[in-house]
Every structure is written in structure tokens, then in C-alpha cells.
Amino acid sequence: MELQLAIDLLNKEDAAELANKVKDHVDIVEIGTPIVINEGLPAVQHLNDNVDGVKVLADLKIMDAADYEVSQAVKFGADIVTILGVAEDASIKAAVDEAHKHGKQLLVDMIAVQDLEKRAKDLDDLGADYIAVHTGYDLQAEGQSPLESLRKVKSVISNSKVAVAGGIKPDTIKDIVAENPDLIIVGGGIANADDPVEAAKQCRDIVDAHTKA
């Protein structure tokens, strides 16, 4: 089970500084969509150049021109790139093929997908490396959790790994861990904590305890 830190609301320098503080406790560090919008793919390059020992995810949320956009993210140092599950099958397949051509991975974000089970089966067949159930900021504000979506997707796929994101914190991660996802994505639960290093360590300890059980 892998742990990912999602960084959304910092500049690239502060993102790299935070990543270096917590890198011993996480496997993947994400340059979130807001950073990409504000600073572009050089933010991915900056993280890749300045933080050792973690994989770098570029959260581009690709919708079209998928092979080109994946190739650009890879050029700037991304190990994993994201595309939206509501994109066309042709776009998903092009993104998968481009990522795999470079030995990289594709994560499909299921935000706004209505029929989770059907789409997850399709994406599994298309070769997605990760399928991520994602309760976005706006639905988190309404009190929604990704747990039920996680169960639905896990029940129907056989090849892709399952990732989960959305409001996960050190005091709620245990419920997520119990569902055995392959990747848990924590954003503000670490990044906005009073002590991000301690928050990351708490998350890692819970993940590791479950993995060893």
C-alpha cells in the first residue's frame, strides 16, 4: 500500500520544501492541479530536481490531446500523470500508451464519473495503472466521503490498482486503510497540519501496521 502527498496550494519552492520534510514517510508526491495552473510543468521539474527518493505525480487532469500532454509531463520529470475518467476511451488509451512508452504510469481520476462500476471496468480493460476514486473539494464540503466509491471500484477491477483521495486525514485514514486500496492520497491532512512531518508519520505508521498485519 502506497502513500501519496498531494500538494495543491503552494508555489513550487514551498512544495519542494514540504516534500523534502516528509519524503521519508511518503512514496509519491503530487504537484496538484492548482500549482500546474499557476506555475506550469516547470513546477514538476523543480520537484523532480530537488526531492530524492519519491515518485512525482503531475495532476494534469487531462481531457483531450492526451498523448501530447502526457509526453510533456514526462519530459518535465513526471513518473505518474493523471487523466479524467470522463475522457473519451481514445484519449485514455492514447495516454496509457504514451505513459507506458516512457516507462511511466497513468492514473485515471474518477471525479464526476456517474456509473463508477461500468467505467472502472472499461478503464481496467484500457490498461490504466491506477483508478482513483476522488471526492473533490466541493463534495467534501457537503460531507461526502470516498469510502463507498472505493468499495464499488475495488469490486469490479482485476488489473488496475485502486487509489483513493478526498479529505483523508491522520484521524480518518484507518477507515480507508481497512478497505485495502493500493494507493492512499492525502492532501491537506498533511500539508495543512500544524506539524506536517508528524501527520505524514502518523499516516505512514497506520498504513504500515495494516500492511504487516
From Swiss-Prot:
GO biological process: 'de novo' pyrimidine nucleobase biosynthetic process; formaldehyde assimilation via ribulose monophosphate cycle; L-ascorbic acid catabolic process; one-carbon metabolic process
Keyword Metal-binding set for record: no
UniProt GO molecular function: 3-dehydro-L-gulonate-6-phosphate decarboxylase activity; hexulose-6-phosphate synthase activity; orotidine-5'-phosphate decarboxylase activity
Pathway, per record: One-carbon metabolism; formaldehyde assimilation via RuMP pathway; D-fructose 6-phosphate from D-ribulose 5-phosphate and formaldehyde: step 1/2
CDD domains in the record: KGPDC_HPS
UniProt keywords, alphabetically: Carbohydrate metabolism, Lyase, One-carbon metabolism
Disulfide bonds: none
Enzyme Commission number(s) from the entry: 4.1.2.43
Domain of life: Bacteria
Catalytic activity: D-ribulose 5-phosphate + formaldehyde = D-arabino-hex-3-ulose 6-phosphate
The keyword Lyase belongs to this UniProt entry's keyword annotation: yes
Described function: Catalyzes the condensation of ribulose 5-phosphate with formaldehyde to form 3-hexulose 6-phosphate.
Recorded family membership: Belongs to the HPS/KGPDC family. HPS subfamily.
Protein name: 3-hexulose-6-phosphate synthase 2
Species name: Staphylococcus saprophyticus subsp. saprophyticus (strain ATCC 15305 / DSM 20229 / NCIMB 8711 / NCTC 7292 / S-41)
